Amino acid sequence: MLLPIMMHSQVLSSLGVAKEITKGTLPNGVEYFLVQNTSDKGFADYALVRTASLSIEDERKSLCGLPHFTDRKPWQFFSEHGVGYSSYGYYTEEGSAGVFRFSNVPVYNQSVADSTLLMLVDMTALSRSPQAVVVSGDINPSKLKERLNLLSMTVPQLDCPSGESSYKWVQKDSKRSILINNPSSDVAAISAIISSARTSRELMDSPQPIVTSMYAELVGKVISDRVRREFRSRGIPLADVEFSYAGSDAGPSDERYGFTLYTSAKYANVATDCFARILSDLDRNGALMDEFVDAKAQLSGDVRSGRLAGRLDNAAYVDKCVSAFLYGSNLASNEVIAGLMTAKNIAPETELPLFNSFISALLDGEKNLTLRFNVPDCGLDAESLGTTFSEAWKEGSDRDYSYKKTFSDTLSLYAPKSKVKLRSEIKEPISGGSLWTFSNGIRVLYKKTAARGEFHYSLMLRGGVASVPDIHSGESAFVGDMLSLDNIAGLNPYDFKAMLSSNGITMKGSAGISDMRISGIAPKSKLRLLLRCLLSVSESRVPDRDAFNYYKQCEALRIDMESLSARDVNSLMDSIMRPEYFFTERKYIERLEDDLPERCEQYFDAQFAKVNDGLLVLMGDLDEEHLKKELCRALGSFHVMKRFAQRPAVNSRLASGAVSYTVESGPGLVGGSEIGVNVAMAAPVPYNMENQVAFKIATSCIRKELVKALSDKGAFFELTEKLEVFPDERMSVFVNCHPCIESGLPADVSAATPLDMLSAVRKVMGNIATMPLSKEDFNAFKEELQNDFQESLQDTEYVIDAVLIRYAEGKDFVTGFKEALKSVTPEKVRSLLGTLASGASVEYIII
């Protein structure tokens, strides 16, 4: 507990309980937490948590037999109804406590909902320790409470909570250094893990843990930014830098602050030295005002956008309630938490010394510090790396970490020189917003949303990566990154990004087969600045050779680091199914040519010469009349063209038949979790709303059958669906299966080998054309799809993407959905499954 701020007594009162959460205690002492969350219509997550678990063997046995489950085992009951394992199975231990979690229970089937509740009550009767039942999802809390009261009569009175914690903070006076070998080619992960004392239970429902987590995030941002700047200036390749904070709500042990950077093993010593000096300087001198204010602005943006304190799904609600029961953490609404994290009731000049006191209390070169080096087998050892860290810490740093003035300087940005007039205004059917056309032909889609203080934007220009001159096979995946490596309006790419960040603006470029986009989020007060930035990107770009060379070093590490992750394997399988496809999403660093930036500039020049062949989308908290004035002022300076280039033909023919590959695990930093079975299936399917709806229901069928097939194999899986409309209309399914952690599986189930999993997956995927689909499941899948669709329409990023697909590729993913859902039949779903079965397929087994 490091927070140095003294709070008034009224501030330390309870944060309250979110309106969607109902909590209480049954007559026998069992507590309950019921969350009404209809975001996943027809489904709910269930959990049972007890403060003192039985032995792992006994907990696992309970999944094999209970008093009211004599005809079939509990885990088989779940399997039959599509309730699969997570990576840890059904059960986990958190210190002395134990938690059962059952996700996506089909409560549309009342008998399944009742049986699941009865199962939890049966499990409760196995122990006298304090326990709680948690249910989150599409439920009626009052009816569920009545049912619990009735069932609880079969469970004897539980022991009263002792109120005492066995936790004791033990300070570590010297650091630990640990070295682990990984199978990557050249990636070294260097971590500093700092422990601190837990927050006392009586303060867990107060603002203090929220403010601590806020300061932790700020520390992470300051250190991450310094690492990126310092490594870049020294030429040390950096694939990524990560920060994590595990507070007292995350588990029973110490709080943990983790900083991890991914660099080249060849630079492990110099990277460790540099990292230590950065931490040492912060400990001694604290953060600077500019970087503190910048970090605060980034944090506010993260909160507003939902990246922090965002909307919770059922699993997150369950975790929140489990934490409240075990550790006393808050059950406050996201609005309350977001308000605390973004409050501006302390001036930066007053808060910075408090923040620096927090940093000083946290950082130490020896105490409560663990150094972890995850490196290839290349002769490095923990002792020498630990010594490098200690010596660098003691010496400190003589570097100047102050921000450049250009980080907030916008004077060099391109200023608008020509004005336009609004020519026409019509209703836009997909978003429900307004489509404006200006006198130079540029189109803008505007929609006011419930967002507060910010807006989403995306500038889409038609014409994809096939238009890059002399593009080589495997280069297209890098094209979108090239825009971020340009000098913009006299600012190098890093200063331009820092300028955006200091003004609360995010910006990311991307380029696909149909179009290129510049997208992000900005504060409403920065609308004019954003338009100047977009104009500067359009008008004043120069490739930065040093930035490209450094990017190439870092990207090689990133590719090595992510090798054989699910995303990497899926892109690999997609490439196998389309062997002649030139524009794969998979990155091959050996195919990245040194002249790509210059060739991309020709492509970007052609794109920005016809801004009227695209669409600017602005959705969020923007005043309509003010926006029109700003657009009339800015859009006249963008280039337009009367005639547009034709989209080039692209060959993406699917291979026929099925192929199977078996490879050994590695390289990569996935840590062994890549072991398993991966399957991809794809088929050409004409795009229309009827086929889209049938495809979504078909994937729900596949998901349920895979749960049944893999339950006795002790495996979990992820299913990803993909619908493409260009260059060819096709539908794809990717399945990634992995063994569960065995301690969370039923006693009579063991984690299977990849080859055992393969037989189960083949049983499902090889027979999808005849897959069963009951009337009850069919109706439930339709209702779930209807709800998902309605939820998606509330997601600004989804709506923007749907709009851009409509105007870039001519396909409508929204209009006619209700009619298609109403008319879809089981026969249509089976027909689409048959089409998938007759397409291309790949098995990729990693052992």
For the regions a language model picked out, list residue spans one by one.
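Short Ser/Thr-interspersed hydrophobic loop/turn segments at strand-loop and sheet-helix junctions
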Residues: 702-706
